[in-house]
């Protein structure tokens, strides 16, 4: 067996000789070849579907019916981030006109594609330029303009555009727009009705605001996901996934901090516009941070720390707050079971008891299991999850799902 050792990752080249399963820093799944992808596309008639989309989902169709935000215009400015684009997409879906400002060389996000595979990119019929699918997806319904904000001409054009807009979504590094004379404190003097929302990972005024590269491109998940326990409690406990000192945490599979921040940015802007149009007639500066928005959705984690100053431990597939709510392995895969209510809990017991009488006896013999608060104790979770796992390991996914759904249990 290869020697296990700590790995300091500096570049892809540094890790090429570390890809042995026992020492590689991450599981690498090779992407399918272009030939394999072409076969799947042909089988699914992907080209026909693409043509249908081009004919039926044209941009001009966006305004074919009255929309809630029709007539409103928003300006987005930001590089290497999806938050401003996700927020713009939500506003655009409600009928607004959203204009993204890109530098002359374009937003670097245009170049992102899985494993650097150019065949996963779309090519413009007009310019021949290739663009990653994720950028196109997040830019749905929006417009892009090229503008160099670091030139006097670019600044003047930007101000004219702001004068015709309702709100700005700014996801540039803290202080960057101010350094150009284009921040809220500058624009609000000329446009007092302007709503200006900054969306960032670390905010615009705290002690961490300046700890970022020029456009903040490598801080999204590392800070937004790690500073608030999101990454820490996502993964398996130490005894289930040993790696020298214990189990490894797991990052979100998507740029979670930016998407949540983008959603709250859209909500924040709508609230500010309502306040302006219904009450004061004045705009305002708003701020959304990726780290804080993830704190909002950490359910029990904040209170967990507040009650006993402990950080919630990793529990893998089990939810420590509900009995049962987990996925567990079965004979040919995995099965998710949700039993968060008394009704579902007892139905789980009735279902498993048919094949596994021990589960039913456990419920009858231990009165603590009959009450939600009691059965969520660690000892009770271990008892019931252990029996559920034993039941699942002897049946396949189809059998498990059919039996659980027969009792109207949330499963799949």
Where do the PLM segments sit?
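Beta-strand segments within the central parallel beta-sheet cores of soluble alpha/beta enzyme folds
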Residues: 74-75, 282-291, 361-366
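Aromatic-enriched alpha-helical interface/lid elements that frame and gate functional surfaces
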Residues: 324-411
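N-terminal helix-loop segment corresponding to the beta1-alpha1 unit
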Residues: 2-279
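Generic secondary-structure signature for well-ordered alpha-helical cores
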Residues: 232-238, 271-279, 293, 299-300, ...
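Glycine-rich beta-alpha junction loops
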Residues: 105, 201-203, 290-295, 332, ...
């Amino acid at each position: 067996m290869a020697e296990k050792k700590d790995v300091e990752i500096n570049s892809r080249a540094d890790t090429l000789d570390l890809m042995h399963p026992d020492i590689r820093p991450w599981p690498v799944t090779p992407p399918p070849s272009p030939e394999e992808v072409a076969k799947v596309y042909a089988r699914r008639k992907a080209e026909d579907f693409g043509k249908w989309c081009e004919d039926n989902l044209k941009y001009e169709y966006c305004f074919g019916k009255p929309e809630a935000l029709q007539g409103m215009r928003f300006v987005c400015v930001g590089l290497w981030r999806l938050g401003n684009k996700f927020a713009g997409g939500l506003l655009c879906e409600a009928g607004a006109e959203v204009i993204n400002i890109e530098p002359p060389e374009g937003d670097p996000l245009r170049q992102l594609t899985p494993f650097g595979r150019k065949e996963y990119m779309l090519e413009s019929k007009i310019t021949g330029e290739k663009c990653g699918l994720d950028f196109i997806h997040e830019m749905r319904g929006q417009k892009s303009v090229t503008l160099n904000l670091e030139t006097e001409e670019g600044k003047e054009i930007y101000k004219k555009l702001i004068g015709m807009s309702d709100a700005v979504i700014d996801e540039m590094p803290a202080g960057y727009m101010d350094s150009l004379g284009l921040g809220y404190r500058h624009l609000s003097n000329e446009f007092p009705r302007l709503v200006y929302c900054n969306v960032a990972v670390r905010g615009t005024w705290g002690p961490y605001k300046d700890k970022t590269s020029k456009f903040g491109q490598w801080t999204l998940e590392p800070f937004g996901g790690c500073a608030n326990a999101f990454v820490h409690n996502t993964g398996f406990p130490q005894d289930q996934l040993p790696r020298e000192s214990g189990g490894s945490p797991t990052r979100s599979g998507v740029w979670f901090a930016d998407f949540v921040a983008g959603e709250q940015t859209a909500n924040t802007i709508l609230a500010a516009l309502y306040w302006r149009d219904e009450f004061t007639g004045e705009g305002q500066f708003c701020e959304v941070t990726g780290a804080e928005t993830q704190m909002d959705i950490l359910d029990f984690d904040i209170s967990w720390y507040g009650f006993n100053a402990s950080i919630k431990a990793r529990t893998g597939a089990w939810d420590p707050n509900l009995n049962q709510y987990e996925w567990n392995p079965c004979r040919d895969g995995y099965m998710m079971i949700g039993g968060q209510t008394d009704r579902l809990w007892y139905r789980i017991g009735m279902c498993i008891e048919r094949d596994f009488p021990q589960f039913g006896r456990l419920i009858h013999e231990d009165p603590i299991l009959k009450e939600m608060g009691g059965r969520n104790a660690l000892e009770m979770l271990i008892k019931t999850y252990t029996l559920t796992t034993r039941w699942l390991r002897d049946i396949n996914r189809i059998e498990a799902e059919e039996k659980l759904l027969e009792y109207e249990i949330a499963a799949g």
